[in-house]
Amino acid sequence: MDGKFGKYGGIFVPELLIPALEELEAAFLHYSKDRRFNEDLEHYLREYAGRPTGLYHARNLSEKLGCRVYLKREDMLHTGAHKINNTIGQALLAGYMGKRRLIAETGAGQHGIATAAAGALFGMDVDVYMGTEDVERQKLNVFRMEISGARVIPVDSGSRTLKDAINQAMRDWISSVEDTHYLIGSTMGPHPYPTMVKHFQSVIGREAREQILEIEGELPDTIIACVGGGSNAIGIFSAFLDDDVELIGAEGGGEGIESGNHGATLSAGSEGVLHGSLSYVLQDDDGQINEAHSVSAGLDYPGVGPEHAYLMETGRAMYEPITDAEALRGFKLLSRCEGIMPALESAHAIACLEKYASKPENRGKTVIVNLSGRGDKDMFLAAGLLGVDL
């Protein structure tokens, strides 16, 4: 494994971390083929996380939009989002490696909750780094992490969001590699993380492919998923990369590309190195990383997983910015049509679906939307944006 997707990916980290990454790669390559490890992983995903998740035909939404819409229900998983697929996988691997402590970064809080849950499950200490701005936005999730035994460490530097939480987590790891595993929550970071996280999230795509073939007898025309770091998207895209299936990623368009206040890294960024890998980043002319903005705490990251940069460059996938206002409309649309409240991250994918369906050439097409998480965590924020005082 060279950790490259075309020219993207690789390892750009301090020399002190190279041995830890090499140890992790060797363990991942070994245990991902180990029968007992895979039996354990399958057991915990089924009995603890709640897999397989359903592929739900959203009939009301389909009728309204003029497409055959299916929702891959990752929102039904324990802890409320797809993140648990990866945290169970990595925490199990860390245990097999003899690590006793997990550290993680989190933006929306979903990865932090899923890491805290995995730590409790496997009896490991957990420290979660979270930007103070995100701590304020996601107070409920902070409590959920703490009640599961994790220590939440607020990060007050820089933009006080996900980027800065990652920086602090990496500093911690440099000083604690002997007994600590850094459980990165998305398909970003230095090799082997993008490949490893994709591996643990690919269960989404494998299930969705099998389910749609059983229901429809053929593959879908299009897959839509939201993209921050990009793990839920790569998880579902992975099973369809070699097929004639259109792949669309919905990025956090914030207040619009022209405003500069957005998280649309692929739509408006450029090549650069961030958090250990070469990908697309939001940066100024001097290469300084810009702050990202999205109504969704999980999409305000100024980078993106390197495989997404490769998929865009090769034309295999396209990426569309979705504004905060459009995402909020998507949140209301799914809630009112189906009684399903999506996470604000997933609402970007619903809004992207709405724009997709408005094009005459897409009428009647079969679309799978990856519903990466549920909206419980966003109720107070969404209510405030909709002018409702709770």
Curated annotation (Swiss-Prot):
It comes from Methanothermobacter marburgensis (strain ATCC BAA-927 / DSM 2133 / JCM 14651 / NBRC 100331 / OCM 82 / Marburg). Its cofactor is pyridoxal 5'-phosphate. GO terms for cellular component: cytoplasm. Keywords: Amino-acid biosynthesis, Aromatic amino acid biosynthesis, Lyase, Pyridoxal phosphate, Tryptophan biosynthesis. The modification N6-(pyridoxal phosphate)lysine is found at K83. Gene3D superfamilies: 3.40.50.1100. Pathway: Amino-acid biosynthesis; L-tryptophan biosynthesis; L-tryptophan from chorismate: step 5/5. It comes from the Archaea. It catalyses: (1S,2R)-1-C-(indol-3-yl)glycerol 3-phosphate + L-serine = D-glyceraldehyde 3-phosphate + L-tryptophan + H2O. This is Tryptophan synthase beta chain 2. Its EC number is 4.2.1.20. The beta subunit is responsible for the synthesis of L-tryptophan from indole and L-serine. Tetramer of two alpha and two beta chains. Pfam families: PALP (PF00291). SUPFAM superfamilies: Tryptophan synthase beta subunit-like PLP-dependent enzymes. Belongs to the TrpB family. GO terms for molecular function: tryptophan synthase activity.
